[in-house]
Each structure stands twice: as C-alpha cells, then as structure tokens.
C-alpha cells in the first residue's frame, strides 16, 4: 500500500489530497495540517490548478517586482533629490511612489508560494503579505485623492495656491493614519481576519465567511477605502475638466470680439501646457487606480453578499494581479507625462533617450520658485 506522504515532505490533508479521480487534487493538498485552519473552506473545495499556472504567475510577479522597484525607486530618488521637483505638490507624488514601492515588496512572498504551488510560507507570512497590501492599496487610493485635490486647486484657483510643505506633510501623515485601522483590525482579528485567497499564494481580508461581522467589515472597508477616494477623485477632476473647457471657451469668445487669434502670450501657453500635462498624468494615474481596484472591490462584494460559486481560484487571481499592476505602471506614466520629471530623468539618465526641452517648462520652473518662496514665508 502506498504511504499517504513522503517522510521528507509535510504531511498531506487526506480529504484534500485527491478528488477521487486519481489525477486531480484539491487546493490545500500540500498544506500541513496545522496550517489548514487558516484557509477558508471555500478554497479547499476547489480543484488545484495546473502547476504551469502557478509558475506563470510567479514569473509574471517577478516582472512586476523588477519593473515596480526600478520605476518607483527612480521616482523616489529623483523627486526627493531634485531641487526643481521639491515642491509641496510633489510631496503627494512622492508619497504615492512610496506606497507603490511598498506594494511590490510583498511580491517575493507570492513568488515563493507560486513556485511551491500554494500556501508554502504559512500563516505568518500571509499576515505580512495582507498587511502590506492593505496599507499600500488604501494609501495609494487616498493619495490619488490628495493629488486630485491639489491639481484642482492649482488649475481652478491659480491665484490661491495655499499648499505648503507643512500642509502637504500633514495630509500625507493623515493618509497613513487613515490606513492603519484597516490593517490593525483584521491583523489582530478584532474585526475580520487576513486569510489566503485564490491559489493560496496571496492573502487578503476575509470576504467569504458567512456571518454578519464579515459582511459588515467588507461593506465598511469597501466604502472607506474605495468609494470615498473614488468620489473625491471624480469630483476634483470633473471640476478641472469643466474649468478648462469654460476657460478656453471664454478666451476664444474674447479673442473673437477683439479680432485676434489668441489672447495667450507664449509664456502663458508654456505654463498652461506644463500644468495640463501634469494634470493629464494625474488623471491617468487616478483612472488606472479605478480600473485596477474595481475588479477587486466587486469580487469582495460578491464573496460577502453574492454567489460565492462565482469566485473560482482562477477568477480571483485576475483582480489580485490587476491591483498589483497599477503599482508598476504609475512611475512610467509620470516618465511620459510629467515635464519636470522627464527633464531630470534626461539629465541623470541620458541613456534612456528621454527628449524634453527645458524651454517648454521654464514657466513651470518659475512657478516652482514662487511656491518655494511662499512656503518659506509660511
């Protein structure tokens, strides 16, 4: 008779070891008995995916880890050391890059689990993985809202720039404090808990337990970590778009009355171009946040309030991947759209082939000086 497990391998959970068809196994087949208790029963009834799926996701996360580390590392390096970029507004960009970098720091846990086909690192590393994900995900969303607020003030109220370094730092601290309860509560199991999900290679808050507390937690965290920042982002950028269109319309009408082609001077055009490019970068990043986190939010709502049978391991890994992908893309959006960042990137890394004309952002440079003088005075 064949033994249930090899002496050199962890003991298998007998009821999860095989589906009865000989070749098929359930998720959790290679999890030690003392770790099974941490896995929601929903996943233990799902079939184990092919090993190739684990390996493919592991390779994909290696790519994300490398791209995000390099991209966000460069953003943090350049924004924190460049005098022209050291402005109160860019404190939010720096904070977003820090959250995105933190997001990618949990990738090695996922990669290790993937190449070991499951819950290999156990519950302790699962708690670390989920804590990092909660901090970075919620923090990125609220920072995007703060960026929207700042862009809203800069573009719609150009004569009332009241953002100072002190205010920016305080807002960033508030963002970190805002994230803390959503990490501490499930981490201490005071309200909900962190558990494995999908292929058991990643972890998040429990959205599958069929009880009132879990449903209340899912609904609450969905509102405060996704709905609130999304509504703020939509409001600020809708105001920006409305202001830009109405401003352009007013200028065209006035120019028509005066029989001139345009009322803008070259300096005004340059300044407007720089501001609009920065706004476009911010809008793009906020759009990416919405697109990448919406699937995960919908998935958690289905788990708590809907038909759990829809949540197959493969289906849940897609939202888990999309919300990590945005942390990789954010820095490259700035590399494409942020004029002063592109100029610094061109100076420090000429081999990247970035082509940014300093004349196009001269007004932005003077704006930076003005902001710094206002900050010093404050």
From Swiss-Prot:
Disulfide bonds: 126-203
CDD domains found in the cross-reference section: 7tmA_photoreceptors_insect
Free-text function comment from the UniProt entry: Visual pigments are the light-absorbing molecules that mediate vision. They consist of an apoprotein, opsin, covalently linked to cis-retinal.
Recorded family membership: Belongs to the G-protein coupled receptor 1 family. Opsin subfamily.
One Gene Ontology cellular component: membrane
GO molecular function, one term: G protein-coupled photoreceptor activity
Record flagged with keyword Glycoprotein: yes
Pfam entry (one): 7tm_1
Protein name per UniProt: Opsin Rh4
UniProt KW keywords: Chromophore, Disulfide bond, G-protein coupled receptor, Glycoprotein, Membrane, Phosphoprotein, Photoreceptor protein, Receptor, Retinal protein, Sensory transduction, Transducer, Transmembrane, Transmembrane helix, Vision
Stretches that traverse the bilayer: 54-78, 91-111, 128-148, 168-192, 217-244, 281-304, 313-337
Membrane topology: Multi-pass membrane protein
Protein's GO biological process: cellular response to light stimulus; detection of UV; G protein-coupled receptor signaling pathway; phototransduction; phototransduction, UV; visual perception
Cytoplasmic side: 79-90, 149-167, 245-280, 338-378
Regions annotated as coiled coil: none
Protein encoded by which gene: Rh4
Glycosylation sites: 6
Record keyword Glycoprotein present: yes
Organism from which the protein derives: Drosophila melanogaster (Fruit fly)
Anything else known: Each Drosophila eye is composed of 800 facets or ommatidia. Each ommatidium contains 8 photoreceptor cells (R1-R8), the R1 to R6 cells are outer cells, while R7 and R8 are inner cells.
């Amino acid at each position: 008779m064949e033994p249930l497990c090899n002496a050199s391998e962890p003991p298998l959970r007998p009821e999860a070891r095989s589906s009865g068809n000989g070749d098929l196994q359930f998720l959790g087949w290679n999890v030690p008995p003392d770790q099974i208790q941490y896995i929601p029963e929903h996943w233990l009834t799902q079939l184990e995916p092919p090993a190739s799926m684990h390996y493919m996701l592991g390779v994909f996360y290696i790519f994300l880890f490398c791209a995000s580390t390099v991209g966000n590392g460069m953003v943090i390096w350049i924004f924190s050391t460049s005098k022209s970029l050291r402005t109160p507004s860019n404190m939010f960009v720096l904070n977003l890059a820090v959250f995105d970098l933190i997001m990618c720091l949990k990738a090695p846990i996922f990669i290790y689990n993937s190449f070991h086909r499951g819950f290999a690192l156990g519950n302790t590393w699962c708690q670390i993985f989920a804590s990092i994900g909660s901090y970075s995900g919620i923090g990125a969303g609220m920072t995007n809202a703060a960026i929207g607020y700042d862009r809203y003030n800069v573009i719609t109220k150009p004569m009332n720039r009241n953002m100072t370094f002190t205010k920016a730092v305080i807002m960033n601290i508030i963002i970190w404090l805002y994230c803390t309860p959503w990490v501490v509560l499930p981490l201490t199991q005071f309200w909900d808990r962190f558990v494995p999900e999908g292929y058991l290679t990643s972890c998040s808050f429990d959205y599958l337990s069929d009880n009132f507390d879990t449903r209340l937690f899912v609904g609450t965290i969905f509102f405060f970590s996704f709905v609130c920042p999304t509504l703020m982002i939509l409001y600020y950028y809708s105001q920006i778009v409305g202001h830009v269109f109405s401003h352009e319309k007013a200028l065209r009408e006035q120019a028509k009355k005066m029989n001139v082609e345009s009322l803008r001077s070259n300096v005004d055009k340059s300044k407007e171009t720089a501001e609009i490019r920065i706004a476009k970068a911010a809008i793009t990043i906020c759009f990416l946040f919405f697109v990448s986190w919406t699937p995960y939010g919908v998935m958690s709502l289905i788990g708590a309030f809907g038909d759990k049978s829809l949540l197959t391991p493969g289906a849940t890994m897609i939202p888990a991947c999309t919300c990590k992908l945005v942390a990789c893309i954010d820095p490259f959006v700035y590399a494409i759209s942020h004029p002063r960042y592109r100029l610094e990137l061109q100076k420090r890394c000429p081999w990247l082939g970035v082509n940014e004309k300093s004349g196009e952002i001269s007004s932005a440079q003077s704006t930076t000086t003005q902001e710094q003088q206002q900050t010093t005075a404050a």
